[in-house]
């Protein structure tokens, strides 16, 4: 449970919007009856968008948790632009129906927060990571590993909220930010991290384990690291091999039956 923000079910960022929508809906209902329906629809949408439920948090010290709800759009070896080192990059896209509260993926200490102005292209696109407005949190885990998690604004999301700063200690699952109306989070982990998700997977904030990160730098072989990332990024390769083998067996059986 977040020691600074005890999960009031509805995110505090939505209180003014929901309160205003509820008051306006009631007022129009009293004056105009069914004409208030659009206002009630808006209020219900705001309630679902700003929901912020408490969740059970995995305590495995090697687990790097998903900071948000959403869909995996990137799993690849890439360059961490904030540390200028090779990293395992995992990106999560959030649509307007996901929970948009951001939580810390691990027990860590924030070493730096970097804000970049930018555009507001569709957060589902790869170029959003480098062109959109974004806010990066650089942190060191309790075991000394360096990780980076980046809030990226989207086509509709025009406001990034970050409540942490250099020197702050974050507990896994602790709330540190919020982005409104569709956005993206990029994670940069050490190259020896083992991805536990693949492109297209749906993830749940703080419940889904994105990767397993050894507590110490294992100095894994770069070739095996690249192969691990490639397997995660292309989950259908093994399935394709199985299907090809099955097709060959089926063809052989048909030949036997014809004879």
Swiss-Prot record:
Q: What subcellular compartments does it reside in?
A: Cell membrane
Q: Which InterPro entries match?
A: PS_Dcarbxylase, PSD-A
Q: How the protein sits in the membrane?
A: Peripheral membrane protein
Reaction equation(s) it catalyzes: a 1,2-diacyl-sn-glycero-3-phospho-L-serine + H(+) = a 1,2-diacyl-sn-glycero-3-phosphoethanolamine + CO2
Q: How is the cofactor bound?
A: Binds 1 pyruvoyl group covalently per subunit.
According to the UniProt record, list the residues that bear Pyruvic acid (Ser).
183
Q: Does the keyword Transcription regulation apply?
A: no
| UniProt organism field | Neisseria gonorrhoeae (strain ATCC 700825 / FA 1090)
The protein, known as: Phosphatidylserine decarboxylase proenzyme
